[in-house]
Amino acid sequence: MRGHLYVGVELYKNGFLDNAKMHMKHPKSELYADIIPTFKAKGSSGFSKELEELALAVEEEKDFNLISLKYKNLTDAITINESFINESSKSLNEKIVLVVSLLEIAAEEYAVGIVNKNVENKFEYQDALGFTVIAKDILTKSGTKNKEEEIKKNKTLVVLDSLFKLWPSLIPTGKVEGDSKIILNAIAEINSI
């Protein structure tokens, strides 16, 4: 979800309002309903209100300062809800499992977005970027318990950083020198660290 939101806000900030609107529809329509039972089970009210407020502000093409505030409110609400996860999910190894799962989604999205270096679906290309940015953000914010974990984290971050060349711009034009196999190879490399 954070991937869709990140890309939507970046597109909005850069003046691509129609593209931003598409990405703001995804989280509510595709993802939020699936996690409502988890919120109920954990005794959380979720973040539907904040998600709606951001989507509405984007739809109404409000000033970017307001969009930025609504985005911050939403990401803060998501962070609060993430605190309901159990302690074992906070370990570096579990964070890396999450990073790999986000990269797997990014690879799927990129494969739909870029086919034989041609832009087939710019929205999926953008989603793949969002998932990759969020994967890096999760790992960057992860703590480590010892030198070995610190080394593992840093090596994984180097692999993640190497992927950003796959997105030369937010709105792809012409040929894109990228392939989803690069993301899949990065996953294999991360798993071997």
Predicted regions and their residues:
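Mature extracytoplasmic or organellar-lumen-exposed domains after removal of signal/transit peptides
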Residues: 1-193
